[in-house]
């Protein structure tokens, strides 16, 4: 396929190179399955990932290699013997380093390494480990720079320079980090403590991801409808035709015919009366970022008082883990808790700073999913909790970086990424769970974790604390998120241990009677429907992956112009808390949620002001 000025697709020549790189990646992944403690294979795969245009995956591989250099250099470490044995094929000739280490000045060996970072003994594997550690720092720091994670990039660059102060590649990378930092901080005098930590990476179904189902197939729809029957007996999952989302304001708002795409949706099989429950969904894929808070570990609801008849129920083996009732206790023991019982993971990512509340919840949702996967012995992406969720993925070719001189601008990568929250801490959690992060690479490779996080960001709802307004409890309800968004919804929702959808008593637009007729689609809402159209679109952009193109939004834009900020389109009034009412703007720091987060929060408020959608629902595709 030829590229042109408006695409980032590969040229025919690049297609061939891309195919070779994908084949090499597969070979190295197979080699890692055979020799999971081989740090050289990790570095080789990091280089391939970098050449494929996945700097985040390159950083993840180099980090695992860096951990293995520590295993080699320290006899008391858990995997020392395995890591040393894996280097045996490279140790026959002390003067010959593996090709991946002969990079720039590193081909001269460890001669300029200082501060105790050189070889820890005369063995040839010690020389390899010492040189490899610097190569790891090179790859990690440059890759994180390319992801936009300047703070971590600077940290690992400085660690590399502490070991090899004159390494030119590290010196160049540090210079580039500071240059980019000046642009992002808009100052010539860069305070490295203020360098941003969050960047963005590719959000896609990776070419080697064979776990993603055909969501529109008869088999998938049959499974989903069997599961849905007990939660929403009057509904069914079907394929829905939806407007394609745009990235910004467009004159297509007033077109009668607009581009559409297909996604899953929920439809009424029977008439549903106003106020009638549409869906009642229970989920164990929950997270709580408050340490020792009085919440059920399983469903996230508040614990009943000790005097209650059923009362809270504790785990017999770890008394600190408490459930709201016997049902939640039994479900937790069946589906996830034994994987974390007495494993000292409770305090990780708890009681975060305000700026990290959102990130901690996404991380803890990932931790819960990993516990489910480990206990059930099922690959994380095969768990039904996430398998059929769409993660607002963008086709790999759209994400591709073309080297053609006629190529357009670089693509906009859309998955928020932090080295701490996407790489370091997930691996730390797995180690706390007594999981061998090398042997279980197929289940816990970084691309797997990224895919899970993309799906969470597409479906998670959260509850704000009544104490400080921060999000402190989150959950993924995979069937609730199948109900597509509309700014004139026919249902509303509340989450309190279970996610409940019910038919609205009155419609938002025109104050028409509520209720849903058989055959009509269930239309959910991921933003405050009282907001004017521009505010709604800004809120829902994080939830939907683009600007809402529902009929109400397009009608109001056509009526009010592209800014669409005059009224809420329902009664002509500015809603409470908007445009300076009460001295605040509803979009900034929503109801006490700290808006200074360095991680993109992308949360949309529920009308009850305590439940929020965390981001990117299973809805419309970006144009």
Where are these regions (language model features)?
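Short alpha-helical interaction motifs and adjacent low-complexity tails used for partner binding
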Residues: 1-623
């Amino acid at each position: 396929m030829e590229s042109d000025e408006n695409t980032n697709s590969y040229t025919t020549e690049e297609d061939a190179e891309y195919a070779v790189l994908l084949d090499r990646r597969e070979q190295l992944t197979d080699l890692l399955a055979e020799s999971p403690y081989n740090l050289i294979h990790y570095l080789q795969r990091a280089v391939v990932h970098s050449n494929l245009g996945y700097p985040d995956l390159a950083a993840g591989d180099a980090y695992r290699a860096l951990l293995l250099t520590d295993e080699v250099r320290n006899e008391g470490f858990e995997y020392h013997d395995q890591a040393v044995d894996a280097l045996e094929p490279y140790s026959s000739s002390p003067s010959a380093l593996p090709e991946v280490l002969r990079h720039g000045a590193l081909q001269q060996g460890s001669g300029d390494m200082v501060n105790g970072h050189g070889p820890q003994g005369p063995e040839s594997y010690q020389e390899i480990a010492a040189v490899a550690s610097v190569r790891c720092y090179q790859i990690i720091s440059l890759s994180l720079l390319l992801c936009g994670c300047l703070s971590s990039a600077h940290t690992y660059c400085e660690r590399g320079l502490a070991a090899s102060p004159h390494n030119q590649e590290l010196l160049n990378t540090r210079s580039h980090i500071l240059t980019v930092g000046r642009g992002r901080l808009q100052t010539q005098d860069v305070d490295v403590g203020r360098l941003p930590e969050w960047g963005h990476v590719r959000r896609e179904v990776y070419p080697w991801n064979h776990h993603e189902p055909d969501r529109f197939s008869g088999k998938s729809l049959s499974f989903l409808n069997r599961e849905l029957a007990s939660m929403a007996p009057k509904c069914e999952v079907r394929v829905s035709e939806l407007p394609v989302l745009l990235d910004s304001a467009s004159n297509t708002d007033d077109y009668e015919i607009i581009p559409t795409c297909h996604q899953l949706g929920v439809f009424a099989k029977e008439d549903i009366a106003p106020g009638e429950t549409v869906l009642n969904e229970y989920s164990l894929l929950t997270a709580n970022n408050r340490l020792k808070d009085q919440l059920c570990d399983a469903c996230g609801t508040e614990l009943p008082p000790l005097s209650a008849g059923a009362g809270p129920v504790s785990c017999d083996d770890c008394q600190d883990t408490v459930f709201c009732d016997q049902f939640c206790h039994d479900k937790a023991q069946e589906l996830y808790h034994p994987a974390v019982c007495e494993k000292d993971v409770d305090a990780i990512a708890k009681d975060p700073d305000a700026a990290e509340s959102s990130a901690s919840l996404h991380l803890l949702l990932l931790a819960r999913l990993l516990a489910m996967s480990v206990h059930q012995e099922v690959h994380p992406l095969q768990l039904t909790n996430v398998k059929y969720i769409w993660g607002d993925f963008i086709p790999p070719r759209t994400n591709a970086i073309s080297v053609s001189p006629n190529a357009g601008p670089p693509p906009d990568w859309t998955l928020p990424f932090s080295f701490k929250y996407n790489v370091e801490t997930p691996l730390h959690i797995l180690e706390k769970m007594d999981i061998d992060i090398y042997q279980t690479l197929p289940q816990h490779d970084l691309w797997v974790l990224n895919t899970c996080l993309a799906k969470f960001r597409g479906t998670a709802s959260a509850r704000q604390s009544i104490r400080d307004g921060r999000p402190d409890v989150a959950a993924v309800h995979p069937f609730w998120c199948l109900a597509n968004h509309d700014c004139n919804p026919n249902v509303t929702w509340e989450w309190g241990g279970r996610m409940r959808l019910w038919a609205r008593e009155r419609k938002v637009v025109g104050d028409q009677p509520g209720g849903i007729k058989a055959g009509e689609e269930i239309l959910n809402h991921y933003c405050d429907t009282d907001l004017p159209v521009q505010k709604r679109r800004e809120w829902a952009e994080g939830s939907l992956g683009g600007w809402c193109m529902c009929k109400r939004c397009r009608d109001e834009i056509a009526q009010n112009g592209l800014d669409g900020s005059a009224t809420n389109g329902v009664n002509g009034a500015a809603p409470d808390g908007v445009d300076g009412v009460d001295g605040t703007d509803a979009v900034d720091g929503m109801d006490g949620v700290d808006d200074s987060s360095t991680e993109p929060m992308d949360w949309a408020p529920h009308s009850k002001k305590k439940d929020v959608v965390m981001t990117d629902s299973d809805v419309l595709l970006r144009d």
